[in-house]
C-alpha cells in the first residue's frame, strides 16, 4: 500500500488518543510505515510521560521523515523546550493547550522560539474546567489563544475539532471570526466543510483586492492601516486555500 490520502491540508497521525494504551506500539509501527512514503506529522503524548518519550524516540528515528509534531497536553514552555531538544533541529511544534493551567501559560508557550502554532484541545479543556461546549462559554479561552499568538508574532491558533460533518462549515466560520487560522477535523468527510468555512466568499475577495489596488504604495494614515492589513490577510488566505 502507498501513502495515506486525505483532503486535509495536513494529516496528523495521532499517537496519543488514536489508540488505547496497550496498542501504542502498534500506532508507532503504523507511523513508521507511513513515513516510508512521505514525511509525517505526529501527535505525540505529553512531555515527560513514558509514552511521550517513546514518541520522541520515534521522531528521532524518523529524522527528516518527520514533518512536525503536535504536542498533546502541553503544560508550559518547558514542555516545548524538552520536545525541541529531543527532536532533530527545526522540527515544527504545535503546542496543544488543553487545561486551565496551560491556558494561563499560553503567552509563554507561544513565545517559545520552537513553538510554530498553538492549538486548542477543547475536549480536555472542557473536562478540566467544567465548561460546556457552548460557544459563549469557550469564547474567552479562544480569545486568549488568539491574543497570545499575536503577541508572540506567530500565526493564529488552530481550533479544536470542527465536530460532525454537517457542523464543520459553521464551526470553521466561527473559528475564523475568533481569529483562528485552522481547525482540527477528526473525519476526512468534515474537511470540505471546514475548507468552505475558512475560504473567503468571492465577493469578499473582490472587495479586498479592489481596496488594495486603490491604495497608495507608500505610507498610509494610521487609521487606514488596519483596514489594509485585514484586506491583505483575507486575500492571502483565499490564495493559499485556492492553491491546495
Which positions does each model-derived feature cover?
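Expand to "…catalyze enediolate/carbanion chemistry for C-C bond making/breaking, isomerization
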Residues: 1-244
Amino acid at each position: 500500500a502507498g501513502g495515506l490520502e486525505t483532503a486535509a491540508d495536513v494529516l496528523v497521525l495521532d499517537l496519543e488518543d488514536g489508540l488505547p494504551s496497550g496498542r501504542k506500539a502498534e500506532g508507532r509501527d503504523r507511523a513508521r510505515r507511513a513515513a516510508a512514503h512521505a514525511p509525517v506529522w505526529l501527535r505525540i503524548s505529553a512531555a515527560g510521560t513514558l509514552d511521550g518519550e517513546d514518541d520522541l524516540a520515534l521522531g528521532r528515528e524518523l529524522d527528516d521523515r518527520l514533518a512536525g509534531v503536535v504536542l498533546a497536553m502541553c503544560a508550559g514552555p518547558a514542555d516545548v523546550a524538552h520536545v525541541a531538544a529531543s527532536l532533530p533541529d527545526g522540527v515544527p511544534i504545535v503546542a496543544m493547550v488543553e487545561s486551565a493551567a496551560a491556558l494561563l501559560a499560553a503567552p509563554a508557550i507561544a513565545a517559545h522560539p520552537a513553538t510554530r502554532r498553538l492549538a486548542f484541545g477543547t475536549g480536555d479543556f472542557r473536562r478540566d474546567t467544567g465548561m460546556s461546549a457552548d460557544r459563549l462559554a469557550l469564547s474567552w479561552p479562544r480569545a486568549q489563544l488568539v491574543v497570545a499568538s499575536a503577541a508572540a508574532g506567530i500565526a493564529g491558533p488552530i481550533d479544536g475539532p470542527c465536530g460532525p460533518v454537517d457542523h464543520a462549515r459553521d464551526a470553521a466560520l466561527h473559528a475564523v471570526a475568533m481569529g483562528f487560522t485552522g481547525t482540527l477535523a477528526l473525519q476526512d468527510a468534515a474537511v470540505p466543510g471546514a475548507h468552505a468555512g475558512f475560504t473567503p466568499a468571492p465577493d469578499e475577495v473582490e472587495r479586498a483586492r479592489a481596496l488594495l489596488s486603490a491604495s497608495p504604495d507608500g505610507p498610509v494614515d494610521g487609521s487606514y492601516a488596519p483596514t489594509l492589513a485585514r484586506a491583505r490577510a483575507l486575500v492571502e488566505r483565499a490564495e493559499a486555500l485556492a492553491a491546495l
